């Protein structure tokens, strides 16, 4: 409840030049298809800026909330799940979201979540992993972190297929990743041939699936 992150991560407007091209004005977009990722939005930039790539609104490659959630993940993996929940709640508190200490409470606070086919053993550690799966998505949306989370958890291919299954069936052909991902191969890129030839220590051995 009262989670402010959606309104930050989704931008429902555009800034456009006014008639004399001296300043920008805010124009609301009514259509959902005209909404954009809202992180580092121009709303935070000084009015009248000329170059949107030269302002005081900087891209953050690593945020404190990310560090806190990584610490929560680490505590959970070493068996200290209560401390993991405490740290996760630090992030939720800052966002105005309801603080929780169990997966049941987390689902009650976020009622539109769907069930995951992974992290489903039912023990407390897996329950926290499920909450963390969602929480990192809410907190770090559009920041380039999600793929690496899914890789770290070993569920990238499963997540791609799950997301595909939730889409409109008429759009399935437009989401090829769910069909074409090969587990054990597509987690990594191939090592370029030039690098293999330049480094004898690699023994001409490419990453799995690219031999």
Predicted regions and their residues:
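Acidic/polar-rich alpha-helix caps and helix-coil junctions
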Residues: 4-211
């Amino acid at each position: 409840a009262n989670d402010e992150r959606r309104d930050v991560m989704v931008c429902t407007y555009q800034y456009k030049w006014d008639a004399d091209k001296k300043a920008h004005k805010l124009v609301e977009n009514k259509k959902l298809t005209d909404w954009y990722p809202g992180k580092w939005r121009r709303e935070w930039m000084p009015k009248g800026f000329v170059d949107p790539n030269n302002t005081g609104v900087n891209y953050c490659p690593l945020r404190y909330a990310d560090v806190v959630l990584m610490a929560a993940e680490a505590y959970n993996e070493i068996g200290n799940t209560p401390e993991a929940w405490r740290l996760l709640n630090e992030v939720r508190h800052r966002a105005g979201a309801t603080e929780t200490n169990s997966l049941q409470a987390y689902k009650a606070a976020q009622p539109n979540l769907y069930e995951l086919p992974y992290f489903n053993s039912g023990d407390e550690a897996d329950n926290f992993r499920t909450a963390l799966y969602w929480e990192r998505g809410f907190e770090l949306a559009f920041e380039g972190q999600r793929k690496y989370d899914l890789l770290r958890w070993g569920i990238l291919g499963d997540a791609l297929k799950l997301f595909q299954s939730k889409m409109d069936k008429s759009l399935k052909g437009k989401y090829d990743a769910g069909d074409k991902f090969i587990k054990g191969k597509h987690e990594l890129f191939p090592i370029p041939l030039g690098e293999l030839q330049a480094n004898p220590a690699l023994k001409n051995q490419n990453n799995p699936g690219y031999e």
